[in-house]
């Protein structure tokens, strides 16, 4: 069928972030939500609605019940009863029930370890049953007071897509494409359905029969059509924003955001037209190492590298003052600061923020290194090399970091290659810069990234690749995992964990991370901002639907404004 006419001023146009959609959509014939790396977040991330949404940016860090009405744990945090809202429907008119939730959990369990979240479901879930169409019971293998928040509350990249049992039960979950526009697939619960998908573009049109509009739970979005275009290099993204051919694009380097703000008066950011030109993401970055390999397996060497780094200069020169540095691997969200603000005594004993080349030199000499005629640390005729693997979006501050390391005597350099992530995951990257997709509400999730359960030998990929192991740290983190976030004991355990982590310094914290995403107000207004933080604006996150529900048209429907 041919597409209906939708005016530009009722259309929302985005680019795409992932490698799979660089240049064109490599996944144009698929909308599979659980294939690692093979599916771009241009659909499944906002069309499978969650039990709950979480907003780390609102004053109270709100949790909003969506498909769930409520849930309750037993006292031991080993059993959960989940109540489903009545009147929720799939896009083919079938009711959305507890059977869909239970089917999804069991399907993932049965397909471990290949599918995303399958290992987690296999690890945690003893059994999941639907007691009736609106009640699910989940029995866990071990206490987990965060289970519903970790897996069924959409925030950032977190949250398991829940799929319709009546479609998926007859399919092979590992190979099902889940896309056939003529058949009305993908069957989803959200307010849009896919009407076109080609290597060049993806179109979604609003569904007048969305369950939330029918039941009065939420009005239909004003955005009538959503278009995704493939990823282009950053200069092309800038041109398309200036020409109003995009309403939003992937995060940009500070200089490029400035160019856009200077040349298109209709464009703003989360922080309006001021630095940091965006919002704090959940992903503070650190300089990491393959801690299994020499010389980085020595904590003193890691401290020597730490003392060579001037974080203030990384911000001032590298990020053109559009950011903040960090000495801990946690994002500065208000709800986390009640933990990180109480670390002064620890940071006095373990002064991560001490830029001190003399201290670097003292450690290096004690370890048997001496400076050669060019001023680089050498031992047995070999220089101390640090080659740092990075991503293109780190090109602003990395050269500054490398120069600091060189001035302190390390033979440092960096490279940004298309296989950077693979190199990090496998451990072939000896040094790298990466972020922490961890804590957004309490410190457990970030510390868990350093648990030895994720350590794989060099050559074997792992999703969390800090490659450090410490039995005492593991024990404390396991205890944190069983502790309710509301329990004051969690703060004491956090302190104990850092008391092991800091002297070992398995990675060197560098910077808070910002999403510098331009918001084009030519066709759409009521964008989220620091003043109105109803959700963050990363369209690849699993909260993108809330942005689409919040946007308001900037023009009357019939207005035809030249895009210039």
Predicted regions and their residues:
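Aromatic- and charge-enriched surface segment that lines or borders ligand/interaction sites
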Residues: 69-114, 131, 137-139, 237-240, ...
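Surface-exposed binding/hinge segments that line
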Residues: 83, 119-171, 522, 530
């Amino acid at each position: 069928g041919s597409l209906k006419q939708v005016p530009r001023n009722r259309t929302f146009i985005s680019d795409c972030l992932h490698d799979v959609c660089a240049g064109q959509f490599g996944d144009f014939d698929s909308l599979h939500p659980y294939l690692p790396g093979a599916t771009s977040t241009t659909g499944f991330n906002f069309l499978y609605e969650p039990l709950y949404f979480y907003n780390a940016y609102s004053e109270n860090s709100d949790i909003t019940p969506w498909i769930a009405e409520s849930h309750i744990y037993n006292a031991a945090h080993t059993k959960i009863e989940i109540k489903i809202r009545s009147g929720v429907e799939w896009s083919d008119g079938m009711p959305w029930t507890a059977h869909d939730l239970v089917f999804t959990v069991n399907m993932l369990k049965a397909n471990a370890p290949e599918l995303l979240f399958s290992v987690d479901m296999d690890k945690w879930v003893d059994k999941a049953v639907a007691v009736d169409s609106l009640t699910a019971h989940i029995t866990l293998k071990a206490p987990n007071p965060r289970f519903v928040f970790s897996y069924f509350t959409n925030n950032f990249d977190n949250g398991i897509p829940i799929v319709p049992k009546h479609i998926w039960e007859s399919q092979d979950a590992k190979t099902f494409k889940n896309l056939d526009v003529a058949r009305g697939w993908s069957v989803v619960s959200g307010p849009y359905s896919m009407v076109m998908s080609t290597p060049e573009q993806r179109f979604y049109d609003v569904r007048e029969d969305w369950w939330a509009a029918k039941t009065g739970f939420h009005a239909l979005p004003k955005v009538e059509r959503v278009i995704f275009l493939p990823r282009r290099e950053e200069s092309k993204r800038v041109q398309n924003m200036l020409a109003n051919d995009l309403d939003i694009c992937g995060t940009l380097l500070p200089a490029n955001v400035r160019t856009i703000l200077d040349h298109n008066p209709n464009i703003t950011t989360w922080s309006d037209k001021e630095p940091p030109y965006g919002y704090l993401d959940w992903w503070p970055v650190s300089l990491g190492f393959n801690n299994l390999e020499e010389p980085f397996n020595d904590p003193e060497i890691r401290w020597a590298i730490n003392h060579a780094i001037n974080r203030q200069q990384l911000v001032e020169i590298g990020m053109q003052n559009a950011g903040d540095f960090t000495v801990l691997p946690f994002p500065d969200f208000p709800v986390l600061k009640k933990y990180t603000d109480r670390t002064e005594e620890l940071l006095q004993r373990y002064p991560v923020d001490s830029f001190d080349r003399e201290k670097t030199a003292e450690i290096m000499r004690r370890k048997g290194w001496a400076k050669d005629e060019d001023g680089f640390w050498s031992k047995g005729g070999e220089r101390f090399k640090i080659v740092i693997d990075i991503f293109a979006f780190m090109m602003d501050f990395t050269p500054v970091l490398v120069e600091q390391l060189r001035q302190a005597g390390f033979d440092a350099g960096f490279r940004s290659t298309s296989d950077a992530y693979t190199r990090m995951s496998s451990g072939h990257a000896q040094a790298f810069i990466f972020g922490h997709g961890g804590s957004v509400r309490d410190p457990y999730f970030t510390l868990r990234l350093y648990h030895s359960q994720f350590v794989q030998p060099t050559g074997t990929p792992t999703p969390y690749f800090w490659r450090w192991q410490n039995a005492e740290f593991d024990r404390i983190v396991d205890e944190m995992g069983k502790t309710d976030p509301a329990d004051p004991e969690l703060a004491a355990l956090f302190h104990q964990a850092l008391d092991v982590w800091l002297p070992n310094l398995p990675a060197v914290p560098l910077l808070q991370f910002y999403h510098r995403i331009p918001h084009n107000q030519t066709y759409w207004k009521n964008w989220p901002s620091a003043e109105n933080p109803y959700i963050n604006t990363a369209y690849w996150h699993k909260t993108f639907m809330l942005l689409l529900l919040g946007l308001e048209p900037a023009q009357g429907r019939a207005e035809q404004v030249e895009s210039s």
